[in-house]
Amino acid sequence: AGEQVGGMRAMFKITIQYLNTRFQFGEPIGRFQALKHMAADLLVDVESASTVARIAAQTMASGSGDSELLTYLAAFTCADNFRKVTADAIQLHGGIAYTMEHPAHLYWRRAQTGQWLYASSDKLRDLYLLEMEAKL
């Protein structure tokens, strides 16, 4: 989850820099309202994943009984948000993000391969629900 949060933060930073340096109609594209809204949504996704991952790590460090539950929550939240952030950031970049010269595709690929390297979000979500059910 921490790796995914780091990837989201890096992708967000690259995207904001691009929005502030790419000019269209004589002004940075980051000034356009629709792009501002998308960038704000990216930040919400990054920060929500970061918060869940931080809480899960703190719970694990303290040895609390909820650590397994929060680990599953952090795992699928960060995986889902990482895929969403990278896909939306690529859309904000436009065509340049699809080229090998730009690093955006590397973050997107990392977000996608997380599904195969670790468990899928659906599997993690199922484990989370089973753990929640067991606690009831």
What residue ranges belong to the model's regions?
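Alpha-helical interface subdomain recognition
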Residues: A1-L136
